[in-house]
């Protein structure tokens, strides 16, 4: 409908880290997706490491991770970032439930999961890199650096989630908001769609670049 002949996604097309076709050969969904792309006839460039490794978006022109810069911009937290990773923030004291609601509203989510103390007054916020089951370092870091709230892309019940819940029950005022991986990174790709034409210089003049949001990964069935 847009007439585009290049799609720039952030994550792999075929559900594995190296985007290997061999491991999914014969899979019905893989075959259908390939047929759809072949019928379309355009090109796909997976832009993952490039935008994470640094693009000149900071106010001083320095290189920053474009994905998390875009997240900070979407949340109106550019001025609250602790450093140029844009993964740690010092925000005005905010009740955890209010922060979760703000996240849902600003990212356009269907909802989110809140773990721990919903009444915690959140100041120190962090987006952990990944929570995938071997999370001793992350638990130690939350404790030693006095992190009030983590905004998790992935979440494992038997490690960080259990720790956050115990800390909250012991009155330590900690919480976690599980926003989802794609939901947290989508704003960075939206940011790229505005930056890309300028980055191309004269070649980008008049180039139509359209951001197409993925939409929330999750649907919620409530009690």
PLM segments and residue spans:
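Active-site catalytic microenvironments in core metabolic enzymes, especially phosphate/sugar-handling
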Residues: 1-223
């Amino acid at each position: 409908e847009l007439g585009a002949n290049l799609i720039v996604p952030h994550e792999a097309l075929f559900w594995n880290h190296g985007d290997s076709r061999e491991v999914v050969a014969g899979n019905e969904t893989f075959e259908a997706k390939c047929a759809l792309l072949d019928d379309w006839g355009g090109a796909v460039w997976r832009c993952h490491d490039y935008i994470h490794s640094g693009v000149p978006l900071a106010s001083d022109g320095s290189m920053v991770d474009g994905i998390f810069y875009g997240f900070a911009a979407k949340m109106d937290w550019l001025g609250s970032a602790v450093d140029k990773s844009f993964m740690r923030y010092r925000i005005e004291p905010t009740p955890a439930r209010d922060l979760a609601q703000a996240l849902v509203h600003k990212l356009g989510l269907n909802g989110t999961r809140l773990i721990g103390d919903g009444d915690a007054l959140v100041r120190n916020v962090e987006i952990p890199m990944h929570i995938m089951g071997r999370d001793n370092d992350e638990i130690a870091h939350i404790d030693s650096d006095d992190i009030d709230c983590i905004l998790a892309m992935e979440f494992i019940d038997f490690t960080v989630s259990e720790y956050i819940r115990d800390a909250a029950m012991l009155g330590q005022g900690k919480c976690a908001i599980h926003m989802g991986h794609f939901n947290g990174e989508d704003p960075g790709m939206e940011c790229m769609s505005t930056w890309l034409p300028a980055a191309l210089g004269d070649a980008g003049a008049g180039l139509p670049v359209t951001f197409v949001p993925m939409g929330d990964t999750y649907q919620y069935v409530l009690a």
